[in-house]
């Protein structure tokens, strides 16, 4: 299979990442980052998500337009655009507080029609659309970011739907990462990617297992590096590139992302409504509000 310029829809979460010690906000979020990086890597990318009509939402929309991403699937809803405030403790990034705002949405009929016309659709754990993944996979190749979730039940239910299943495995040694990738493959994923930060990555497919080291870089901020790696891998697979070439290009792209603040740039002065902010623990403990 070779698709020179694949069409990819990224569905789900977005956020403005607000750096407390810089008074700057950057557009981000797993699905939104994926759309931008896929577009940069030569795909035709569309982002389907939701923002509010506030400063953060307008900045997200403008940033996507500036990157050439199709925003016809970006909804504007009453409420607040999602944000996360990021601090710095002894050189380590710390997530201080956040608000999911209107960012968690369910797919509508028009979203599914658009997905059916695409080559692939990307989403992930942070988008909270697991109940709709079968609908996605029925219409296009599904790329799903499990992040750090590795429960048997989740892998067994989602991996069979996946063209590309991706995991963040910075805490895994090489053998554990390889075992996880093979478990996802055995559960039904066609391709499985494990990113391990500075320890490199492994891509397991129908006929090959390919490992690659991380590319050297001066790390400023790792936010968005995993999304970069996944997007470059998906684009490469759809183009029919060799796994080794895909991983080398993805590692180089992720290294570049680590060299600056924010997922893909576009800083603006922080302007958010913190009246509904919660701690990160509270965010994870509370069921998300899903907007129709």
Where are these regions (language model features)?
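Short, acidic/turn-prone active-site loops that include or flank metal/cofactor-
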Residues: 31-32, 99-101, 146-151, 169-173, ...
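Active-site metal-binding loops of divalent metal-dependent hydrolases
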Residues: 13-14, 170, 228
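Hydrophobic anchor at the start of a short beta-strand
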Residues: 8, 45, 71, 141-142, ...
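Histidine-anchored nucleotide/phosphate-binding helix
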Residues: 31-40
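Conserved N-terminal subdomain of the carbohydrate kinase-like
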Residues: 16-19, 25, 43-120, 274-292
């Amino acid at each position: 299979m070779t698709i020179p310029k694949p069409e990819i829809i990224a569905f789900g979460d977005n956020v403005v990442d607000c750096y407390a010690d810089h008074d700057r906000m950057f557009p981000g979020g797993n699905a939104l980052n994926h759309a931008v990086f896929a577009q940069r890597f030569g795909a035709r990318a569309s982002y389907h998500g939701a923002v509010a009509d506030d400063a953060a939402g307008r900045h997200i929309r403008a940033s996507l337009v500036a990157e050439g991403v199709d925003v016809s699937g970006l909804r504007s809803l009453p409420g607040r655009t999602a944000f996360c405030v990021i601090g710095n403790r002894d050189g380590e990034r710390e997530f201080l507080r956040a608000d999911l705002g209107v960012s968690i949405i369910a797919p509508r009929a028009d979203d599914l029609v658009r997905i059916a016309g695409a080559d692939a659709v990307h989403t992930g754990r942070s988008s909270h659309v697991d109940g709709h993944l079968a609908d996605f996979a029925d219409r296009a190749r599904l790329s799903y970011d499990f992040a750090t979730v590795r429960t048997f039940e989740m892998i067994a239910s989602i991996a069979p739907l996946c063209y590309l299943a991706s995991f963040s495995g910075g805490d895994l040694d090489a053998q554990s990462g390889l075992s996880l990738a093979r478990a996802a493959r055995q559960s039904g994923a066609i391709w499985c990617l494990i990113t391990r930060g500075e320890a490199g990555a492994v891509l397991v497919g129908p006929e090959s297992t390919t490992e690659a080291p991380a590319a050297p870089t001066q790390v400023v901020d790792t936010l968005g590096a995993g999304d970069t790696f996944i997007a470059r891998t998906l684009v490469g697979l759809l183009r029919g590139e060799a796994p080794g070439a895909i991983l080398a290009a993805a590692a180089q792209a992720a290294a570049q992302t680590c060299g600056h603040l924010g997922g893909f740039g576009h800083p603006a002065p922080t302007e958010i409504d913190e009246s509904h902010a919660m701690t990160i623990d509270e965010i994870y403990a509370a069921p998300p509000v899903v907007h129709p």
